[in-house]
């Protein structure tokens, strides 16, 4: 009874405009930042290294980027009202759900193979046709 009431209240605050994303994807997260009495949008662009799905209100994802040679990670609640929008820039071809190994890599070694568009993975593995 109480759980249903809590779920009904939480349902009002859940986002419905979420893009399909997973670990390895390059994303651009637009967050609302309040400075004094003004509010502005700040963009954080990087690679999703973890996507934790739990109860609808507790899902979170971690985005990592390297800024001026320093690795920066930021955790975002998926349904946060501070997130204005999430754009998926590219899909990374990874076989892991948590990419914490990227923390120890530098330079080109820390880059992920990017897939372009839907079905790009299928086209890459298709056998070439003889001419």
Swiss-Prot record:
The keyword Ribosomal protein applies. Keywords: Ribonucleoprotein, Ribosomal protein. GO terms for cellular component: cytosolic large ribosomal subunit. It comes from the Bacteria. The keyword Nucleotide-binding does not apply. GO terms for molecular function: structural constituent of ribosome. GO terms for biological process: translation. Gene3D superfamilies: 2.30.30.790. Belongs to the bacterial ribosomal protein bL19 family. This protein is located at the 30S-50S ribosomal subunit interface and may play a role in the structure and function of the aminoacyl-tRNA binding site. PANTHER family: LARGE RIBOSOMAL SUBUNIT PROTEIN BL19M, RIBOSOMAL PROTEIN L19. This is Large ribosomal subunit protein bL19. It comes from Anaeromyxobacter sp. (strain K).
